[in-house]
Amino acid sequence: MPPTDAARHSHKNFKGLMRTLGGRMTAWGPDHATIEIDVTNKIKNGIEVVHGGVMAALIDTAGAHAGIFCAEPGRIRHAMTVSLNVNLMDNIGEGVLIARARVRKAGKTIFVSSCDVEDGDGNLLATGEVVGRYSRGSHLPEGVELAPKNTV
């Protein structure tokens, strides 16, 4: 799936684990996010299928991003995961993982996202739920001012 403009921007900003796993945002907008990861040897476990921790990280990242989309230039929304529930139902040893998350409910402090992980053929591999806590001001769609980068 070709990425949306917002998704393309986010991909440039993936850091840490999701960058290491090869995650790419293919859709991102108000209350939804889609992230894909190609299955490679580096994300497989000892029985040659995707490690459950990779599925959990994918659900966590997609679910969190669904809750923090901000379309305002120069602004951002922040949140942290306070609860993560993952149900592993099937697995693959090759292909692509596609995580589709959507916000089910959001308030001033907390949001809840649900996420399904499927393979490229649409077979359900995992489901999950993310409960996120917004940082101050991040519950608003316009978010907060993006902090300037330290140039020192």
PLM features per residue range, with description:
Residues 1-152:
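Terminal targeting signals and extreme-terminal segments of soluble enzymes
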